[in-house]
Regions:
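Catalytic core of membrane glycerolipid acyltransferases/transacylases, capturing the structured
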Residues: 3-54, 98, 113-114
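Well-ordered alpha-helical segments embedded in enzymatic catalytic cores
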Residues: 10, 59-62
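Non-catalytic C-terminal accessory region of glycerolipid acyltransferases
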Residues: 19-22, 39, 43, 61-169
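Pre-Walker A (Motif I) flank of P-loop NTPase domains
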Residues: 1-6, 70-73
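A conditional alpha-helix N-cap/helix-loop micro-motif detector
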Residues: 53-57, 84
Length: 169
């Protein structure tokens, strides 16, 4: 199992990229924005893991089962409420607990609708051209002494990938 990590505002277009085995399991919130995301993800054949505000332990149980099944967990480090481009989730602890490696993904399209929300979420428009860019390396959380160093590496790689993809489109 691996954790696929992408900034939240690139999320909408990136769900179209996964046509492989193992299964990709995005984490979505029970908030109404998350419910919209779930509808879109299911339409494209993904099977999201629901993060319910009142039942956080159910998500951990589902992640554990997905990890045992060899599924890939898809997570946005700056979600669900931001701030944009800052890590506010426990990716380090999650990756260590389930012995997962971390892979960076970025997405950009030439035509999109931008929401006026906390992260300026970009929704690709029909017939636009897009590009997916996977990170240069697979990040092993076991090679880091603490969460702070791991998060610094993750932010560096996410931003380097974002910068590189901006040069294409």
């Amino acid at each position: 199992s691996v954790l696929v990590v992408i900034w939240h505002n690139q999320l909408m277009g990136s769900t179209f990229s996964w046509k492989f085995k193992p299964k990709l399991r995005p984490i979505a919130t029970s908030h109404r924005d998350g419910q919209l995301s779930i509808l879109v993800q299911k339409k494209f054949g993904l099977d999201p893991l629901l993060r319910e505000k009142n039942k956080p332990s159910s998500l951990i149980k589902n992640i554990s089962q997905a990890s045992k099944n060899g599924d890939c967990i898809y997570i946005t480090p700056d979600a669900p409420h931001g701030p944009r481009y800052e890590i506010n989730t426990n990716i380090y602890k999650l990756a260590l607990k389930y012995d997962m490696r971390v892979i960076i993904l970025s997405f950009k399209t030439n035509k999109f609708f931008k929401l006026n929300n906390w992260d300026k979420l970009k929704i690709p428009l029909p017939f636009s051209k897009g590009i997916y860019l996977w990170g240069k390396e697979i990040i092993d959380p076991n090679k880091f002494s603490d969460e702070e160093n791991f998060n610094a590496k993750l932010i560096f790689e996410l931003n380097a990938n974002k910068k590189m993809i901006n040069e294409y489109i």
